[in-house]
Each structure stands twice: as C-alpha cells, then as structure tokens.
Amino acid sequence: MSSTHSRRIKFVSISVPILYGNHAIKLTPEKRKPTTPPEHTHEWTVFFKPVLGDIDLTPLIKKVTFKLHETYENPVRTLESPPYQVTETGWGEFEIIIKLHFQPGVELGINEKNFQIFHALKLHPYNPQAPQAQQPQVQQSQAQPPQQQFGGEGGSVGTVIRERENGEVHSVLYDELVFNEPTEKTFEILTSKPVNLIPYKLSNLDKRDQEYIRPDEIDELNRMDIYIDKVKQEIENQRNQYKLLEQEKLALLQ
C-alpha cells in the first residue's frame, strides 16, 4: 500500500492557501515580567497557519520550526501540533526562518520536500515617509540564512501591515503551498476538505488583521493593476523624452 500511495500523480498541481507573519504590541509595565530584559520594548508572536482555520494539516506536517535571532536562548523553536506560533519579547526587528517539516516517508506515501519561509519580524507600523533617524533599530545576525528549499512553490501576494487603535501591529502575508505532481497520499490529505478555497467573509469581525478573505485578494490585484498602469505610463514618458532628446541631438548636428 505504501508504494501505491507514494506514486506521484502526473500533470496535477494542488495548492494550500496559508498565512504567516507576526503580531506585536508595546510592552507596558503591567505586561513586563521579572525575567523580561529591561531593553525589550515589545511583545510579539510569529505564526504559521492555513487560511481556513478548520483545516488540519497534521497528517501532512510533522512539525514547524521557527529560527529566531541567535541572541535568543534556544533560537530554534519546534512545534509538533497547532497552533504553530512562538511568543517572545524583544527590541529589534530581524528575519525569522519558518520551516515546515513534512511527515517523513515513503511508508506514509507523502515523501514531500520541506518548505522554508523567510519572514521579516515587524514591531512598528510601516511608514516610508519617516526620517531615517526615526527608523526602528534592527538586530543584526552574523549568520547567513540557509538557501530556501521548497516542498512546493510560493505565490505570495504581499505583506499587509496594519496598526490597530490599541497600538497592535499586524504583519501578515498570504502565500500558497503548491504541490506539483503530489503523491497519492498527499493528494488524498489535501482533497479530504476544500483546503484551497479562500473565504469571502471573516469568521469574526475582530480578526480583521488576522485573516485573509477573497476581497483582500481582489483589492491586491486592483492595486497591482494601478501600479502596472503607472509603470507603463512612466515607460511611455521616458520613451517620448528620449525621442525629444534624439531630435535635439540631430538638430545640433545639422
């Protein structure tokens, strides 16, 4: 049975919409613990989850690891069951490596490569107009992150960074795990429920910054169309300017 389940289905791709990112909020005196370092300014939670909250990926995913900055004690955190998230405190922003480890095995018929994601931890709302001196400090790591290895292919739409009235910062990114020619067992797991359907409505209005719904994708595509038009217009402007310069050059040579 294992050899049958480990056979790959040719000319088939299946995707799983996912969300990953972090939530952060400034530390208040009430939230500080005796063990909290005095220089830490924020509490944050980094996470990975399927878009549809009722989808169980444990038959497919053995564990999820989060590689934090090397200055943290035990920088590689391992979670073998959902919720796949890590909560910590800190003062700086840095890159977190999220790695999905699939169930090992030809014996299970899964036999998929691990999937690695890089997430830039955000503690502050994004403000491109802020002066350089006011930009948040970043913890730097000497170690270079390993090369990305994909069990599927990513199709990220873009990071949504929002600040709520209470000061919480939410940096959430939509992506898709795409399995090309999955094994029969992987296909069976991923088709047991409609995992690739993005909901049209929020499960809870208070989770606006934590969920991804179909209108978000439509809004993002509309924004992309606007910027594509702007780029096309700029290319046309540059082309016209180049023609004028060429005409001026020819006039000077006559």
From Swiss-Prot:
Keywords, sorted A to Z: Activator, Chromatin regulator, Coiled coil, Cytoplasm, DNA damage, DNA repair, Nucleus, Transcription, Transcription regulation
GO molecular function, one term: chromatin binding
Main subcellular location of this protein, as a coarse class: cytoplasm
InterPro entries: YEAST_sf, YEATS, YEATS_dom
Region (Disordered): 128-158
Domain of life (superkingdom): Eukaryota
Membership in a protein family: Belongs to the YAF9 family.
Entry domain remark: The coiled-coil domain is required for assembly into the NuA4 complex.
Protein's job: Component of the SWR1 complex which mediates the ATP-dependent exchange of histone H2A for the H2A variant HZT1 leading to transcriptional regulation of selected genes by chromatin remodeling. Component of the NuA4 histone acetyltransferase complex which is involved in transcriptional activation of selected genes principally by acetylation of nucleosomal histones H4 and H2A. The NuA4 complex is also involved in DNA repair. Yaf9 may also be required for viability in conditions in which the structural integrity of the spindle is compromised.
Name the record gives this protein: Protein AF-9 homolog
Record organism: Candida albicans (strain SC5314 / ATCC MYA-2876)
Taxonomy of the source species: Eukaryota, Fungi, Dikarya, Ascomycota, Saccharomycotina
